[in-house]
């Protein structure tokens, strides 16, 4: 999906997303918070105290992650970058300062080398042509500090409910889902090290009493989503 396609859906992004995930019984905010909880845990384990640290939300769009980033990283600074100017305008109107919202051309990130402590992308790369992944992962790596980390969250194409949901989603029309192993290979080929996979999001709301098990199921390739976590 290009910038104009994202712009087209920007105003109704949340309502479309909510309708699309109705079978889960959850809201877009539930999934956004889920990801930020994972990021908090990973950062605490690998980087420790990141008070005053700088984080990059690659493909941050309308800013869905922002309130939950602020909840789990109250002393850190977040920059949301996206190709969709319209989405960024909505993010600014909703959340504004101290979060930064920055447009980029889809080619080169407008930041100096070693700017950020950590970068994350929440279900973004399946919208990007596979041939562009290496270049953009390289850009993310370039703007990370030498000790930087990256978390790439994606939909799991091995989960049939995920595939059905993506196929029915208007803004996923041109999506190409990525297997976890393939994404890890691309991340490591871009220069990141020690990339590891964890499968996530196993139980819909009617089965929420089972969610306490999810942290022990990261090895099982049937979660609705997964992340790859790597170091520069």
Per-region residue spans from a language model:
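A C-terminal cap/extension of S-adenosyl-L-methionine-dependent methyltransferases
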Residues: 149, 185, 195-232
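Acceptor-substrate binding/catalytic loop of class I
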Residues: 166-182
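N-terminal, positively charged/glycine-rich alpha-helical extensions of SAM-dependent methyltransferases
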Residues: 1-21
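A short glycine-rich, Lys/Arg-flanked "PGG" loop and its adjoining helix->strand segment in the class I
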Residues: 134-146
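Conserved beta-strand signature within the Rossmann-like core of class I S-adenosyl-L-methionine
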Residues: 147-154
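A conserved beta-strand element that flanks and buttresses the S-adenosyl-L-methionine
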Residues: 120
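Conserved alpha-helix/loop element of class I SAM-dependent methyltransferases that forms part
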Residues: 32-51, 68
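Class I SAM-dependent methyltransferase SAM/SAH-binding core
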Residues: 56, 62-108
């Amino acid at each position: 999906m290009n910038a104009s396609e994202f712009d087209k859906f920007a105003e109704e992004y949340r309502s479309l997303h909510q309708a699309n995930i109705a079978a889960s019984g959850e809201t877009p905010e539930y999934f956004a918070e889920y990801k930020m909880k994972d990021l908090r845990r990973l950062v605490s384990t690998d980087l420790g105290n990141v008070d005053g640290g700088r984080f990059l939300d690659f493909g941050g769009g309308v800013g869905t992650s922002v309130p939950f980033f602020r909840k789990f990283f109250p002393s850190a600074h977040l920059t949301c970058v996206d190709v969709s100017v319209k989405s960024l305008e909505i993010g600014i109107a909703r959340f504004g300062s101290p979060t930064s919202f920055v447009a980029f051309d889809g080619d080169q990130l407008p930041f100096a080398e070693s700017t950020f402590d950590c970068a994350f992308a929440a279900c973004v790369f399946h919208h990007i042509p596979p041939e562009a992944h290496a270049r953009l992962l390289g850009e993310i790596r370039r703007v990370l500090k030498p000790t930087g980390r990256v978390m790439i969250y994606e939909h799991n194409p091995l989960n049939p409910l995920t595939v059905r949901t993506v196929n029915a989603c208007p803004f996923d029309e041109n999506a190409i889902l990525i297997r976890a192993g393939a994404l890890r290979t691309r991340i490591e080929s871009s220069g990141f090290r020690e990339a590891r996979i964890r499968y996530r999001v196993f139980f819909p709301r009617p089965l929420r009493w089972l969610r306490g098990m999810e942290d022990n199921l990261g090895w099982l390739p049937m979660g609705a989503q997964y992340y790859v976590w790597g170091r520069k």
